[in-house]
Amino acid sequence: SFILSMQIPLLSSSSSSSSSRHSSSHRFARAVQMDDKDREIEEDLQYYRPGAMLRNNWQIQELLGEGGFGKVYRVQNMIDLTNAALKVESVRMEGGSAIKLEKAALEHIHQNGTKDHVPMLLYTKRRANANYMIVTLLGENLSRIKDKHYPKGYPVKCWIKVSIQCLVAIKIVHDSGFLHRDIKPANFAFGNPADPKKARIVHILDFGLSRQYVLDDPKKKGAYRPRTARPHTDFRGTWKFASPAMHDGSELGRKDDIWSLVFMLMDLYASLPWERCDNLDAIGKMKQRMKDEELMIKLPPELIPITKHLRTLDVYNRPNYTLINDCFDKVFTKFKASWIEPYDWESREAAVRNLAYQQGSKQMYTDPGPFLLEDPIKINVGPSKYSSSDDQVPRVSAKRSTTAVNPSSQPSGSAQRPSAKNIPMGTKEFIPKEGSNEAVPKEEPKDPKEPKN
């Protein structure tokens, strides 16, 4: 069956020592007085169940996951029979709509052309009681693959190929002007196994904690300027993989996504030094004070220069993606890894088919050097010549999408999730299936009243 990898975590990953520290895994799971809200939320989502139609062509097929504020379904396009994922959330979502934020991030990332390592946003809609989005249906995420196939850790040849792809995916996000801020194994997934064009591609997903780190430069068309770093930020992300700066409450930059990538790869390959520690402050001190050789002792030594490099960067600096990839490439060469070799979970038939598409399309991740040198943002210093008052309305130019995307061409929150109130949702009509089952409400949810400007 199809597995949705931008699934809803049902348990919190963050420390219980402080209610102000939130992981992205709270985006549906964490509710205020859930006992009092359950019934209301269920009413908000009652239309969204197998058999219901969206836009008169997407039919809900099966439930893939659910949490306190929303559900995820597999949906099928009844015109071309393609499958996708539906994520629907109650408007009672604490901290505001995660779907609005994800919509904004995905539109920015894909505005200059489809990016292979990022799910496509196919459609979004805002209703009176719920918001929903239809996105690319992916395969299993890296966390689930480890649990099923490699409980003692990924074999090095597979692990290093995953490492390179994850770096490419993160840089794609950075090149769009966004930070992900919740890098972890559950937020990366291989493509849908039924789609040979995507099956071997690792995708980055779940942008509910993302943040724009640049603004349009009003003095130069097509250029950007950095947002001024805030003096303090609340904890967000997932404590196991959060960067050292996050434990200090410091503003995050591109380097912090790479720190989280290092910790994520450490977790996939072996284990984290703080695996059995549940004290957030103690974990932060370990990340900040351990020498690189000690911190990276379970990883190939070729990767030690990565953390040494990261410690030299401030919040505005651009990471040296080429240096990082060179470290990965040394491991790739040392252990004679190959992009041609099948993955353990691929059948022989699927491996042959997927390889043919991989070689035919010349996937960028097999030779990422030129891409990693590109720097469309061109920011490596702080905004000394700009006033911090200019940062009140962050924007990076993007084409506003209000229509569905052809399927042939996918989503986490905190107490202070970046404001989504000005981000528009899709405007296409939501039309229920004619002659639908009695279990599906006969009347579709009504549109909310649009606020006056």
PLM regions and their residue ranges:
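Activation segment/activation loop of eukaryotic-type protein kinase catalytic domains
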Residues: A189-R236
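Catalytic-loop of the protein kinase fold
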Residues: H174-N192, P196
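Juxta-kinase regulatory segment immediately upstream of eukaryotic protein kinase catalytic domains
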Residues: I8, S20, S24-M53, Q61
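Conserved N-lobe ATP-binding subsite of Hanks-type protein kinase domains
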Residues: K71
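ATP-binding glycine-rich loop module of kinase domains
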Residues: N77-L101
